[in-house]
Regions:
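PLP-dependent enzyme catalytic core of the Aspartate aminotransferase-like
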Residues: 39, 186-187, 196-226
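Active-site pre-lysine segment of PLP-dependent enzymes
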Residues: 7-19, 31-54, 58-91
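PLP-dependent aminotransferase class I/II
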Residues: 81-156, 160-163
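Conserved PLP-binding catalytic core of the aspartate aminotransferase-like
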Residues: 145, 154-187, 204
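Short beta-strands and strand-loop turn motifs
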Residues: 22-28, 54-58, 163-165
Length: 226
């Protein structure tokens, strides 16, 4: 990641060699929640040698509020070296069913076919129903946006640094990430130690929940620093 917690596409490009076959870009990024601008991604894809496929994971795209953000689905269905993946596990609320889909040209999909597994009939019916419930998607998106703003306000009041996010989670700089994680757990608040898991020093990753959950988290975080 760059100093702004975005994918360092230049650094990724420098690591590509004759043995490279697959490059994955998660956009929005996990764990930072930041997004790579569409123009930068298009340039990155165009720079790839023919033997490299770029997989763009758009699992969190439905949480993005940035007006300039645009998914890469249209690029994937027109270029043989791009595959876009999306999921029903996030904003659609179906994480246990493990159902998602990919966008690519037919030849690329054929090459990846052997690595796929078929979802159950229950998962298919649930995903179909989820696609028909756009009210849920809109409500969840709005709740997440309001939750972000609330957390930004409270974290600013506490004097804590954080990464502005376009997803349903965010990174917060807390100093002793392991210590704060343990103190929060004692209050039944469970966050991810981003320092230990993703090597993002001194940060925790917290999911953005309902207003009540966010308030509970802020109260616990204040207590952890007391």
């Amino acid at each position: 990641l760059t100093s702004e917690f975005r994918h360092d596409l230049d650094a990724m490009q420098r690591e590509i060699n004759d043995r490279t076959r697959l490059v994955v870009v998660t956009n929005p990024n996990n764990p930072s929640g930041t997004v790579v601008p569409r123009a930068d991604l298009e340039q990155f894809v165009a720079s790839m040698p023919d033997h490299v496929t770029v997989v763009v994971d758009e699992a969190y795209m439905d949480y993005v509020k940035e007006p300039a953000y645009k998914g890469m689905g249209d690029v994937a269905v027109s270029r043989p070296n791009v595959l876009v993946t999306r999921t029903f596990s996030k904003i659609y609320g179906l994480p246990g069913l493990r159902v998602g889909y990919a966008l690519a040209v037919p030849e690329t999909l054929k090459n990846f076919w052997m690595y796929t597994s078929f979802p159950s009939s229950i998962a298919i019916h649930a995903a179909t129903a989820a696609l028909e419930d756009m009210d849920h998607v809109a409500a969840t998106r709005q709740m997440t946006w309001e939750g972000r703003d609330y957390l930004y306000y409270e974290l600013n009041a506490m004097g804590l640094s954080y990464v502005r996010t376009e997803s349903n989670f965010m990174l917060i700089e807390v100093g002793d990430a392991e210590g704060i994680t343990r103190k929060l757990a004692r209050q039944n608040v469970y966050v991810r130690n981003a320092d230990r898991i993703w090597k993002v020093g001194n940060h925790i990753r917290v999911s953005i929940g309902t207003r009540e959950e966010n308030q509970f988290f802020i109260t616990a975080l204040r207590q952890a620093f007391a």
